[in-house]
Each structure stands twice: as C-alpha cells, then as structure tokens.
C-alpha cells in the first residue's frame, strides 16, 4: 500500500492547465528518431527502439523508445510517476522506496547491506577501503572522510548500512533545499565530476529533444533559470545492481501536465558508483485505434559513465544497442504491471 502522501502528491501534480490538443505522430516526427510510427503495431505490443546519435560528450550515450499502454494518458503518467521496478528481478532493482518531503531518517529504515551476494560484498569492500583522501565511490571529500571514519569505527554490514543511510539523508536534504544547484560533486576518485552538469551536457547534445521538453526542464530547474523552478517532484531512493555492483541511487520524478498530454523527467541526481547519472524523459499522449483508447509513450534515456570515455565508433554504437534492449526490458515490465492492475 502506498503512503498517503503519494495520493495527495498525485492529485496536485495532475491539476491541468488549458493547452491545445496535439497530434502525437506529428510531434514525434519533429523531435524523435521515429519519423514514422504505426500505432496499430504499438497497440498490439511492439516497442520501437533506436540508439541515440553519437555524442561529442565523451561519457554519455542515449536511447529512444516508443510504446503504448492500455490506459489513458493521465493514468499512464500517474503510474510512471511512482512506478516501483523492484518487483521485477530481471531489472536488477534490489530496493526502491519513496522519500518524504522534508525527508526523515525513517525514510531509510529499510536500508540493509547484510548479504552474501557478490554485488553487496563489492560495495562493502569499497566502503571499508575508503579513506579521507581517496575512494572508488562517488563521494565528496567530506563524505569520504565521514564514511571512512564511520566504517572504521564499526565495519559490520549493519553499521555500514547506517553510515550510508546518514550520507543519503544529507544528500536528499540538500537537494530538497536547493534543487539541482545543490547537488554536490563527486571528488574522492581524484577528479571533480558534477552529475548535474553531466545531465545538462547530455541534454544539450540533443537540441530537438531539449526543445521539446523545454517547458518541463525549465520548471524543474534543469535548464534555464533555476530560480524559476516551480514543480515539486516525487523523491525516491533505490539500490540497484549495476555491472555486478550494488549501487545506491537518489532520484526525483517531475510531472508536467500540458493539456491533453504529459511530460515527465526521472533523474538520478546521485549514484554511489559505477556510473555518474541516469536520466529518463517521457512524453505521453492519448491515442485511439478504432474503438480502443490507449496512451502513446515516447521515452528517452541518457546515461553518463566513466567507462564510456574510453569507447569510440563501433564500441559506442554497441553500448547504445545494449542500452535499447535493457530499456525495452523495463518497458515490458511496466506494461505487465499495467495489465495486472487493469484486470
């Protein structure tokens, strides 16, 4: 059962202003990798997928997908806003939890690293190996010092879980105060990396996509004047397996109603290791095929990771193709959840 605050949050997000109705197929032609879309095939279950064009930004790749779900556009937006992927083992989402605003220590009470799984042991080992001056994890220098002292005091997995809970709580608190401008950089690996700057760099690589989502990106403070950010997000924390590594993430999902259609941004503004940030954009329209009414969804995914800086040409294209397949897995899982709830 979802907390009551989610229900009130959804109601506030779906207060709709008046905009002219849009032709989704014309919109897709204007900004996406899909100049022609067969709605009947999508309604029958097909998922379109294409790797994004190669970026000049050395650490990023992207992918675009398009699919349909058998609910209204409004309902699809509501479900994507708070969708929990952890029920699907193939998605490697170990845990997923909503975070209240203002956040509280109780939001992280289920954080537990006690496990014999290889992915957990990697995170525990890297946490214990962290020093005040160095870490393989994505931390500020102060966080590295804090985590090193905490783990040295008690290296037990349960105690280390508490160390991480405190660190994540502090990061969420800072984001809730200052938004993307308050996201601290990663420093402990020896170079300074801003996940917020990487997010913006990837979006600027695809100006037609950034232009399509300008209303949303400006209202959540990703692009333009951050002082103009007015949207309230859904906050969450998660624990994922990324490249066999247990990886904490802190994320936000913003929803902007635009008349008959909706835009969403799901941004992981903190990732504990393996990659830097992951961003997903959605645009959702109402469509009809015969007597059937469904939601048409365009999805764009962007990931920044240090290993991508060493890939070029064919290797980078291969990563993009793999990304499309992984995104399709997540879409299938979401579609399955929608179908189950509609029974």
For each feature predicted by the language model, list its residue ranges.
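Terminal "cap-and-tail" regions of soluble proteins that handle hydrophobic small molecules
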Residues: 21-75, 81, 85-343
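Bacterial N-terminal signal peptides
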Residues: 4-17
């Amino acid at each position: 059962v979802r907390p009551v605050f989610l229900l009130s949050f959804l109601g506030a997000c779906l207060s709709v202003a008046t905009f002219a109705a849009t032709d989704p197929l014309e919109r897709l032609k204007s900004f996406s990798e899909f100049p022609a879309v067969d709605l009947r095939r999508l309604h029958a279950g097909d998922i379109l997928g294409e790797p994004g064009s190669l970026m000049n930004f050395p650490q990023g790749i992207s992918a675009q997908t398009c699919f349909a779900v058998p609910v209204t556009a409004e309902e699809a937006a509501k479900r994507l806003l708070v969708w929990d992927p952890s029920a699907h083992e193939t998605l490697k989402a170990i845990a997923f939890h909503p975070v209240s605003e203002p956040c509280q220590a109780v939001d992280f009470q289920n954080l537990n690293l006690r496990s014999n799984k290889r992915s957990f042991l990697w995170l525990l080992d890297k946490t214990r190996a962290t020093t005040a001056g160095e870490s393989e994890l994505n931390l500020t220098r102060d966080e590295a010092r804090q985590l090193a002292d905490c783990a040295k005091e008690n290296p037990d997995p349960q105690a280390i879980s508490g160390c991480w809970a405190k660190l994540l709580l502090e990061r969420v608190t800072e984001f809730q105060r200052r938004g993307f401008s308050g996201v601290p950089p990663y420093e402990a690996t020896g170079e300074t990396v801003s996940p917020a700057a990487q997010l913006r760099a990837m979006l600027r690589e695809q100006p037609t996509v950034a232009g399509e989502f300008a209303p949303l990106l400006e209202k959540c403070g990703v692009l333009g004047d951050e002082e103009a950010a007015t949207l309230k997000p859904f906050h969450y924390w998660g624990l994922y397996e990324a490249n066999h590594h247990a990886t904490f993430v802190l994320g936000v999902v913003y929803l902007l109603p635009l008349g008959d259609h909706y835009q969403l941004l799901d941004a992981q503004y903190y990732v504990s290791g393996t990659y830097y940030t992951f961003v997903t954009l959605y645009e959702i329209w109402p469509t009809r095929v015969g007597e059937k009414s469904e939601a048409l969804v365009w999805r764009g995914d962007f990931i920044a990771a240090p290993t991508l800086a060493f890939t070029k040409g064919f290797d980078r294209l291969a990563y993009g193709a793999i990304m499309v397949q992984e995104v399709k897995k997540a879409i299938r899982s979401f579609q399955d959840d929608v179908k189950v709830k509609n029974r």
